[in-house]
Amino acid sequence: NDMAIFNFQTGKPNIIKVIGVGGGGGNAVNHMYNEGIHDVSFVVCNTDNKALQDSPVPNKIQLGSEGLGAGNRPEKARQATEESIEDIKKMFSDGTKMAFITAGMGGGTGTGAAPIIAKVAKDMGILTVGIVTIPFRWEGNRKIDQALDGVEEISRNVDALLVINNERLRELYQELTVTNAFAKADDTLCNAARSIAEII
């Protein structure tokens, strides 16, 4: 079963795991991985097989068997994640003590899958921290409403939740282009996870 690929190097610290779920979370984790943060292990989880293949992160879980993404439908991502629940449990069964679940809320996979992955970790007694973004205003009300539902759901399944409001970030950095705005959001996610990991 090549749906879940784990290449955790032995002797490497698996105590803190940073899990990127969906497009936004995956981008943030790819970015952190490329920055060479060493004291944590990284995993990307996605319903979109292509996004997983494009990720430099060696540890990946494809959620569900289709591999075609969730098409902005959290319900579809939820079903896919339930299908892959054993892979998710296995990912956490290596001595993980703390998990950061990072996702962009508002799309399908981040919104639907992240709360379930967080719940698995928390149910296993792992200290679970959610770091999520909510969309820019121009992404539309439907996406924002969907994101807020996701935030509410993940908040029930984590020990701590950090919500990064992309719109607020844009107000702080008014000169940002759209691409840079997303990059800045990724940076903020990275810095948050890195800071918390260093405290511990």
Predicted regions and their residues:
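Tubulin/FtsZ superfamily GTPase core signature
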Residues: N1-I200
